[in-house]
Amino acid sequence: YWDDACQASILGLTFGANKNHIVRAALESMAYQSKDVLDAMKQDSQINISSLKVDGGAAANDFLLQFQSDLLQMPVQRFKTNELTALGAAYLAGLSCGYWTHEELGVDLQKEFVPEKTSKEMDQLYSNWKKAVKTCQSYK
């Protein structure tokens, strides 16, 4: 939503909300944004994406990864190596100069999250997310 004029907001809070609700909202928004990006990638490339491999600090959060799996309706895989981006760059460099082959490369899976909720449940939540984005975009 590359909209520089759009301001961040948290919608739907009640007087019963606490810091845990704020944290959950932040984590859910990360998953929704990932879905937006993956949907755009699928549309542009016409390639089906069947699983998501994650790394980095946020990948340590089980709630986030389960929510992503439910939202995307696909497995989300976390590996033992937390910084796969750097490792991937090293792998590509080694492959390009012939230091190793594809068969020699391997990364150990730590945990796989599979969808636990139905696409119907998650589609409703995603629809609400899209409404929230439009609301934020209209407030300038």
Task: Give the positions of each predicted feature.
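Glycine/Thr-rich phosphate-binding loops that ligate phosphate moieties of nucleotide
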Residues: Y1-K140
